[in-house]
Amino acid sequence: MTRTTEPTIHLVPHTHWDREWYEPFQRFRIRLVDLLDEVLDRAESDPRFHFTLDGQMAAVDDYLEVRPENRDRVAALVRRGQLAVGPWQILLDEFLVSGENIVRNLELGWARAEALGGVMPVGYLPDEFGHCAQMPQILARAGLAHACLWRGVPAGVDGHAFAWTAPDGSAVRVEYLAGGYGNAASLFADPARFAERAAALEAALRPRFGDQPVLGMYAPTTPPRCARWSRSSPDWRRTTPRSAC
């Protein structure tokens, strides 16, 4: 893809979801329910809006336990491709579980996502602090050709994509989330500084992306007024990890 006009930023609306961390599970679930209530309303009112649910079905399960009446709404958005779910049941630490656990995790998440309307066909692993050598083999055997990583990637990776190869020769294409899964989180915080921040993000990531659109991972919702901001800044569009890979 060759850049023909202004630089392009591909923005992925998403959340990174820790079920339990510095607060108990139920406190985090309150935030999850509030978030997805807003996401469902936004997606239903704007067919251009897409949202990625962190690659793990557990967030869907936790939400629907509180909002079972919204299952059909969630499924409709999954079927339309506006809500990207799976392929994992949970995001895992690859060194704390067995190899079979990793495979079963993927199997379960994949099946549950398909039952809801479709699985995101990306090995989404943004927050693992290291990766087992066989992970590309596991992903490839599952039929996944693409992955997204942030943590656990060697410092020597200086581009935005690379081939990740397992000992058996299996390989997947990795989109490296340079700057992390929130590298564009502050982009829309201040309307007066949108152009400045968008240009700064594009400039910071351009060396990695060359003539390709740069990838920005950011907060879940975009204020409607943002559409006009791009006139004085790099062109941008909302997308999903699958489209960005």
Where are these regions (language model features)?
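Catalytic-domain carbohydrate-binding cleft regions of carbohydrate-active enzymes
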Residues: 1-245
